[in-house]
Amino acid sequence: MKADKLRQEFLEYFKKNKHEVIASASLIPDNDPTVLFTTAGMHPLVPFLMGEKHPCGTRLVNVQKCIRTGDIEEVGDTTHHTFFEMLGNWSLGDYDEEQAVKYSWEFIIKELKLDKNKIAISIFGGNDDVPKDTEAEKYWLEAGVAQDRITAVLDNFWGPAGQTGPCGPDTEIFYW
């Protein structure tokens, strides 16, 4: 599948599930001195994740252009790039992590028709301040991911970009 087709199918799937498509924000963030570039899909949405009302509603979907330089030494291996597009579906207080996992699973298994036995998941493994994300692990197991295909890692934690701000554990999907 080519990238254009994947983008289109992702946006269409979430539109079908009552999400509004929003445009990719600028690669140079407005009014944010903490970063040089937009580094993640959620970066332009931080004010809305903090409670500000988004003009398009509480369910959003986008394909955000991103540039990262923090791990520039690793660019060129099999997993790191400087520029990439991040597919994102966003619930601004509309649905919970369990529903987000269900949407992700349905998209990759039913829409993309990926082999579920080749899906691997990473979850936040916990640290001294925040415990392991057992909730995400539970939802992935309920969706049908085998226990031995779920890995807890320490760096599955987003933000904050500065001293404070939205942050928390994340989960990622891999295919091999």
Predicted regions and their residues:
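Structured aminoacyl-transfer and RNA-binding surfaces used for tRNA recognition/handling
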Residues: M1-W176
